């Protein structure tokens, strides 16, 4: 760890000490001023510098064992389980999201990996909705999409719960089981060498065949690591090939306006023998 109020100079000193003559950096993720300062420091020290975002992103796709361990540890902390104990009638989306984020901090998270999505009843049909002062009522469903960041690495998980059985429980439980089956098929399809498009299609066909195709409007998943969204993509329009050691999300969903939505999301390691879920939380339908 370098501690300095002149990190460009400290970086140059480090590179010189190990006799580095040329470096490649990724422009994305840097403030323009930081990027310019690094370039100027390298030029003045005669260290060659080049920018190649694509190659650096590609190097990051397959994760090393230590990276996988950090991400797995991030996923399997108990913030969600502890938050469920706080669920009660009339709690707001905002209050429950705050409790979940507090529990993630208590569980060792440095910060949230992204803005927590926590929604009730018909608002669960918004794939990326933000918490409001909407109050929870008996019979509502609850969608939680959250993750923590620790040591720079992100986690991403979604679960949908039911707070009792409301008037729409029969239809929503049917939707839940379709999403659960699509989630299972998506994970089963994954292995090194498959394309993101093929993986997406394996889950999407389950949803289409049950008559909900038009209500699944996003890709099946994405890579996760130092960024919450990184390569590769599991998408109907992108043909990237999955390689071993990659970590991706599998997150099918069905979202029906004015009724509600269901999404189930796990993070999955790609291996030559198949996709291996990193989560230890169940995907069974749970009525609280």
Feature annotation, model-predicted:
Residues 1-288:
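Active-site neighborhoods and metal-handling regions in enzymes and metal-associated proteins
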């Amino acid at each position: 760890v370098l501690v300095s109020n002149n990190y460009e100079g400290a970086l140059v000193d480090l590179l010189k000490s190990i006799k580095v003559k040329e470096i490649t950096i990724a422009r994305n993720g840097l403030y323009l001023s930081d990027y310019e300062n690094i370039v100027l420091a390298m030029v003045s020290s005669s260290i060659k510098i080049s920018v190649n975002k694509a190659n650096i992103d590609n190097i990051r796709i397959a994760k090393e064992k230590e990276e996988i361990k950090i991400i797995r540890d991030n996923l399997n902390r108990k913030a969600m389980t502890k938050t469920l104990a706080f669920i009660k009638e009339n709690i707001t989306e905002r209050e429950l999201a705050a409790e979940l984020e507090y529990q993630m901090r208590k569980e060792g998270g440095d910060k949230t990996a992204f803005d927590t999505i926590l929604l009730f009843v018909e608002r669960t049909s918004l794939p990326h909705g933000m918490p409001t002062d909407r109050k929870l009522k008996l019979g509502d469903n609850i969608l939680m999409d959250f993750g923590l960041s620790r040591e720079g690495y992100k986690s991403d998980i979604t679960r949908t719960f039911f707070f009792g059985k409301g008037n729409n429980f029969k239809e929503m439980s049917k939707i839940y089981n379709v999403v659960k089956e699509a989630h299972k098929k998506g994970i089963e399809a994954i292995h090194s060498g498959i394309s993101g498009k093929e993986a997406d299609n394996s889950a999407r066909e389950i949803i289409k065949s049950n008559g909900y195709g038009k209500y699944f409007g996003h890709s099946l998943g994405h890579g996760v690591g130092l960024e919450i969204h990184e390569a590769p993509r599991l998408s109907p329009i992108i043909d990237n090939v999955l390689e071993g050691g990659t970590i991706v999300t599998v997150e099918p969903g069905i979202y029906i306006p004015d009724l509600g939505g269901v999404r189930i999301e796990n993070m999955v390691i790609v291996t030559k023998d198949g996709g291996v879920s990193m989560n230890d939380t169940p995907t069974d339908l749970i009525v609280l």
